[in-house]
């Protein structure tokens, strides 16, 4: 009887990838050592290379998963709160995270942008692609809100989304630098004003 080549997978690939995504989100690409990833994912080195091939490919898959999950979340929020409400809810979510934990993980795409641009140029194109994906998504929400009359600000949608993303990502950076609940509340108010 012929033996099967290789061992069958004894782990859930999707679960392992999700765990890796959260680890990259918390620690960044460079700081995520292979041994740490293996421990977090609950798999052996042979299984890692057989399934994910390399740390870089795992990171790429993690960034894809993060984007997919985020888009699904934002679209769900839009269904619940409308386009304008979904954009405001993202800022409220950041505020709640600060209230509950005193810090924020920020956005994996934006966190990766600074890190990859400086040291891992070969990953920069992927990060830029994901940034554009979020930009297009948020801009579509703004355009929809303007068409429905929920957003009466008639400023060009590209300008609004640029300011909006700057506020969201700036808020995360401020929290990591020591800003607290009061500062984020100011930005929540500013976002609401922007999207009036």
What are the residue ranges of the model-derived segments?
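Amphipathic alpha-helical segments used for helix-helix packing
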Residues: 100-122
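N-terminal intrinsically disordered/low-complexity leader segments
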Residues: 1-11
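Generic hydrophobic, amphipathic alpha-helix propensity
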Residues: 12-21, 37, 62-66, 70, ...
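C-terminal peripheral helix-coil segments that are non-catalytic and often amphipathic
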Residues: 1-3, 91-96, 132, 136-144, ...
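Hydrophobic alpha-helical connector segments
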Residues: 61, 75-105, 157-164
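Helix-turn-helix
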Residues: 15, 23-57, 61
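Amphipathic alpha-helical packing segments from all-alpha helical-bundle domains
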Residues: 85, 121-147, 159, 189
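Hydrophobic alpha-helical segments that form the core
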Residues: 105, 110, 153-174, 190-194
């Amino acid at each position: 009887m012929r033996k099967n080549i290789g061992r069958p997978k004894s782990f859930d690939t999707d679960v392992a990838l999700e765990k890796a995504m959260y680890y990259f989100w918390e620690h960044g690409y460079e700081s995520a050592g292979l041994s740490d990833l293996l421990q977090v994912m609950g798999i052996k080195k042979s299984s890692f290379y057989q399934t994910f091939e390399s740390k870089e490919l795992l990171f790429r898959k993690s960034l894809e998963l993060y984007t997919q999950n985020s888009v699904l979340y934002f679209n769900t929020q839009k269904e619940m709160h409308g386009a304008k409400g979904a954009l405001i809810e993202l800022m409220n979510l950041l505020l709640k995270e600060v209230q509950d934990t005193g810090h924020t993980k920020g956005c994996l795409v934006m966190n990766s942008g600074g890190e990859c641009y400086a040291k891992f140029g070969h990953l920069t194109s992927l990060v830029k692609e994901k940034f554009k994906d979020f930009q297009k998504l948020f801009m579509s929400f703004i355009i929809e809100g303007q068409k429905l009359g929920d957003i009466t600000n008639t400023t060009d949608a590209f300008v609004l989304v640029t300011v909006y993303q700057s506020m969201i990502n700036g808020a995360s950076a401020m929290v990591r630098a020591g800003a607290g609940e009061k500062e984020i509340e100011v930005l929540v108010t500013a976002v609401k004003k922007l999207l009036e």
